[in-house]
């Protein structure tokens, strides 16, 4: 009887530990892959148009476009590592002042800002994503 109680206690503890681990793993995956904890409101001063495209892996990439009527030139701005397009707001205001006849596209790289994915280093995939933005323009 005593042995049975010990086995039951060990088994119950293992099940509870497994359930707790599953919950923490699910929470971590949701935050890193789907990034449900991120607030999606950006830009205090500028009111850009939000545009979305898919890259070659079908991940949705988000950009924020400051569009000027009857203009063919577009400046693509890329944020720093682990930041997002809203970190470019001051620079966008500056470029608007010196290049008033230019559209400005501030992009959220893969895994940053409102774009899908997990943050990774800057590399070949990011270059390919910028090529997709060039095609969008």
Could you say what each language-model-derived stretch is?
Residues 86-89, 114-120:
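Active-site lumenal/periplasmic loops and adjacent helix-entry segments of GT-C-fold
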Residues 81-95:
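The serine-hydrolase catalytic nucleophile loop
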Residues 92-116:
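Conserved alpha/beta-hydrolase
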Residues 5-54:
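An N-terminal hydrophobic leader/cap segment in hydrolases
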Residues 56-67:
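A short loop-to-beta-strand scaffold at the N-terminal edge of the catalytic core in hydrolase folds
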Residues 72-80:
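Short beta-strand element of the alpha/beta-hydrolase
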Residues 62, 79, 112:
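Histidine-centered divalent metal-coordination motifs
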Residues 120-137:
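Alpha/beta-hydrolase active-site loop
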């Amino acid at each position: 009887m005593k042995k049975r109680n010990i086995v039951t206690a060990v088994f119950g503890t293992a099940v509870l530990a497994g359930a707790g681990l599953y919950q923490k793993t699910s929470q971590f995956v949701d935050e890193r892959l789907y990034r449900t904890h991120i607030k999606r409101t950006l830009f205090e001063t500028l009111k850009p148009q939000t545009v979305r495209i898919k890259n070659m892996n079908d991940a949705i990439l988000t950009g924020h476009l400051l569009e000027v009527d009857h203009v063919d030139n577009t400046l693509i701005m890329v944020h720093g590592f682990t930041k997002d397009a809203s970190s470019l707001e001051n620079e966008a205001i500056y470029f608007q002042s010196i290049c008033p006849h230019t559209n400005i596209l501030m992009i959220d790289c893969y895994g940053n800002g409102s774009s899908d994915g997990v943050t990774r280093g800057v590399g070949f995939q990011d270059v390919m994503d910028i090529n997709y933005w060039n095609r969008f323009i």
